[in-house]
Amino acid sequence: MSDLDEDLLALAGADESEEEDQVLTTTSAKRAKNNDQSLSKKRRIEVGSVEDDDEEDDYNPYSVGNADYGSEEEEEANPFPLEGKYKDESDREHLESLPEMERETLLFERSQIMQKYQERKLFRARGRDMKEQQQRAKNDEDSRKTRASTRSTHATGHSDIKASKLSQLKKQRARKNRHYSDNEDEDDEEDYREEDYKDDEGSEYGDDEEYNPFDRRDTYDKREEVEWAEEEDEQDREPEISDFNKLRIGRSFVAKFCFYPGFEDAVKGCYGRVNVGTDKRTGKTSYRMVRIERVFLQKPYNMGKFYTNQYFGVTQGKDRKVFQMNYFSDGLFAEDEYQRYLRALDNSQMIKPSLHSLSNKTKEVMDFVNTPLTDKTTDEVVRHRMQFNKKLSGTNAVLEKTVLREKLQYAKETNNEKDIAKYSAQLRNFEKRMSVYEKHHENDQSDIKKLGELTSKNRKLNMSNIRNAEHVKKEDSNNFDSKSDPFSRLKTRTKVYYQEIQKEENAKAKEIAQQEKLQEDKDAKDKREKELLVAQFRRLGGLERMVGELDIKFDLKF
């Protein structure tokens, strides 16, 4: 080995530590610089991701109500655990003892409460499922981020060691040529920048996984796939009584929506619980589950607060009948009514409706109910209602006046001068018609008063006639011979014996007195006749008359 080689080795060995320190210092400085750049990039990315998340949260349908579910961990108690209508057996007995109208009203209110309870229960269950899915997705993202950062760290460390050794080798060989060494230094710096940029770029991609909106969309897609699969499984089952109860049309629904446009199409295919009378064996009201086929227009009838001419044409199997809408109950279908309807379908060889068709019809009814009211729709509702309810008093007047006021208020809020003038004039005309109607009604009070007086007079006359008829009937009954009717009640009188004896004695004494009086009268009459006869002889020549009446025969012979 020559002295030159030894000098080179010595120089290489002596400068090795310095070069290593220099290389390590340069590498650490560059790494710190690159780390600062990557951290600044990460900060910018994280800020952007937070903003993106905030923007996405505004449109996230699954984030609604999540904050409320944390405080509602405890399950809400079922308000009506017995058949979904009663609190207990005593409550059932109390409801069945009430009048039909009051019972049906309470059952309808309880059905609304149960529907809200089921919705809250479903929302809580969905909220819990969403929170669990979000937690699982977050854990998966954290684990994926940890693995990605670990891989990035290992790769970066390996490349740094390799680059440091390579730079040392190059710098040892660059002692012979300074120019080549300078060029190699520039290449090394470019290599360091490229490798550090690749490392930072890899870390940025790792950070991109934290805020990538497509990950959220993929999560939603997975959830939708799961929910769609659950819905398909749900649609495969047989329909139950609860599914039919969702399509039940009652008296309250009819009273609210019967004048709305599209009501006939909405109720077609729904189900109802119709009152068919009283059961002779139990004495309770009997109901039947029927399917509404169409709406008929016939003679108007009273629905309670208004008149309508709409009738429901219903079927149970092959049996068809037309009912007034006020015969439909707001109560839920009972199990025996549901089974009776299924037996009617089987006897008629008709197919039971599928759950898919029931769900579609339920959505159609909900769309009809949730349709917003427009000016045109409101005018049509009022026009249909006024067809058989033309009086200005009562509910119709209140409804029409309320509609006009709402239209006027909306016109004032929108500063529409044309509509303000229009609805103000209509409201004034309506109030004028109301005042005219009230005055006319006051003028009719006199006629009503006269009619009332005439009615009262006729009522009194009828009462007197009835009283006389009852008196005549009573007299006839007194004169009626009870012996002719063997089934009549025998009338008895209390008999006091000493009074009867006294009466008999009085009668005998009276008879004796009458006889004595007759005898005295006879004696007095005979006495008067004798006195008269004596007087005739004395004063009226009675002797001469008697002599003249004597028939004396003389026989004279000469």
From Swiss-Prot:
Residues 238-370 form the Plus3 domain. Residues 168-178 have a biased composition (Basic residues). One of its GO terms (biological process) is negative regulation of transcription by RNA polymerase II. It is found in: Nucleus, Nucleoplasm. SUPFAM superfamilies: Plus3-like. It holds the Pfam family Plus-3. The modification Phosphoserine is found at S17, S71, S477. GO terms for molecular function: DNA binding; RNA binding; RNA polymerase II C-terminal domain phosphoserine binding. Keywords: Activator, Nucleus, Phosphoprotein, Transcription, Transcription regulation. This is RNA polymerase-associated protein RTF1. It comes from Saccharomyces cerevisiae (strain ATCC 204508 / S288c) (Baker's yeast).
